């Protein structure tokens, strides 16, 4: 299926522009500065989180895919309208950069574009776990969500095998949604059109992480360049994160490695920076609006990565446990540790659903 000019316009609108406005509105609610890179990242994290919250119950109820499309689209329209009414887009800015740092930023952007071009060429070279593509294509074709046996093509009444994992992490259904609203076939969406967007999100997250580590933009750009070079030349094994990112980013577990884990790391780093260092154990922990927003971002990110792969339930839980323990001691606040650990409730709930289905 060849994408028409209209399909490309919808692709740019829904996958490149709309997430920025959605993310900017979310940044406003979480007391975050809504720069374009941060808005782009927060847009996708919030879109994934809400899709996870909406879609899993609808899959369990065996509702048609069209209902999911309508309900989720209403959310997107609602959050964009909220941003327009509240005029949150006025806070959308490009980060101010020192003149001396522009050379590094230009090199960083050139490296990122080169990586996207190379990945664009390589995403069709690997067919492992193509059942994700089959699930997405079948969802669009039959209007059923994960109710087709990928081996036989026949409709099933209950889930079996790998579908147990997909029910609580319906990444293929999200790809099907993108296919539905843009008119681009699900296979083309996953292999060709979605990877460049995900790589752009990954690079923006790297930039945000660099912002938590370095004050000067030249150091931030060098940090991102180093990471991108490691990814570009890291294709020395079929099992490492670099390979999954370059040639298999259409898989949910690859997106978890490239986007999900860095997003969690950024959420934790930002929370750590915002929490005070000079408090005593006996002092009552009180959070301001920005700190509450940072805690909400941790929860939001945990919901978001839950959509990508069932592996996220283990990976994010380990990260939550470790960071919560460190924060509780370093910040001398048991409440902070509990607030971080409580994000595990998301994973416990979805794993409980999967267990009951078995």
Regions found by a protein language model. Name each.
Residues 30-34, 88-100, 273-293, 297:
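Membrane-interfacial, low-structure loops and terminal tails that flank and connect transmembrane helices
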Residues 114-233, 240-250, 259:
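Active-site lumenal/periplasmic loops and adjacent helix-entry segments of GT-C-fold
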Residues 1-97, 336-338, 347-357:
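Membrane-embedded, hydrophobic transmembrane alpha-helices
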Residues 316-341:
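Perimembrane helix-loop-helix junctions
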Residues 59, 284-311:
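Membrane-interface alpha helices of multi-pass inner-membrane proteins
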Residues 26, 30, 57, 206-215, ...:
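Transmembrane-helix signature of membrane-embedded glycosylation machinery that interfaces
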Residues 19, 250-279:
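Specific aromatic-rich, kink-prone transmembrane helix
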Residues 99-127, 231, 343-355:
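Transmembrane signal-anchor helices characteristic of membrane glycosylation enzymes that use polyprenol
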């Amino acid at each position: 299926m060849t994408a028409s000019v209209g399909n490309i316009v919808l692709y740019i609108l829904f996958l490149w522009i709309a997430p920025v406005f959605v993310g900017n509105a979310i940044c406003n609610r979480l007391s975050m500065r809504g720069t374009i890179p941060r808005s782009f990242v927060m847009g996708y994290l919030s879109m994934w989180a809400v899709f996870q919250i909406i879609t899993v119950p609808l899959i369990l109820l065996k509702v048609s895919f069209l209902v999911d499309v309508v309900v989720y689209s209403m959310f997107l329209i609602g959050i964009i309208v909220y941003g327009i009414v509240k005029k949150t887009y006025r806070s959308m800015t490009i980060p101010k950069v020192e003149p001396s740092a522009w050379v590094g930023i230009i090199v960083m952007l050139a490296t990122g574009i080169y990586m996207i071009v190379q990945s664009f060429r390589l995403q069709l070279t690997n067919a492992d776990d193509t059942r994700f593509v089959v699930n997405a294509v079948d969802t669009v074709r039959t209007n059923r969500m994960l109710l087709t046996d990928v081996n036989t093509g026949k409709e099933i009444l209950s889930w079996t095998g790998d579908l147990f994992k997909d029910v609580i992490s319906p990444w293929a259904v999200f790809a099907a949604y993108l296919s539905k609203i843009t008119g681009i076939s699900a296979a083309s969406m996953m292999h060709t059109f979605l990877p460049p967007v995900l790589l752009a999100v990954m690079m923006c997250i790297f930039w945000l992480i660099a912002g938590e580590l370095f004050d000067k933009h030249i150091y931030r750009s060098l940090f991102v360049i180093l990471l991108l070079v490691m990814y570009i030349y890291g294709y020395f094994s079929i099992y490492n994160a670099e390979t999954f990112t370059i040639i298999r980013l259409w898989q949910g577990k690859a997106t978890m490695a490239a986007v999900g884990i860095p997003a969690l790391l950024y959420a934790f780093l930002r929370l750590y920076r915002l929490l005070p260092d000079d408090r005593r154990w006996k002092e009552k922990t009180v959070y301001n609006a920005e700190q509450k927003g940072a805690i909400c971002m941790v929860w939001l990110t945990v919901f978001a990565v839950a959509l990508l792969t069932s592996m996220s339930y283990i990976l994010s839980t380990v990260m939550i446990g470790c960071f919560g323990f460190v924060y509780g001691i370093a910040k001398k606040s048991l409440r902070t540790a509990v607030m971080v650990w409580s994000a595990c409730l998301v994973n416990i709930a979805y794993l409980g659903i999967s267990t009951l289905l078995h």
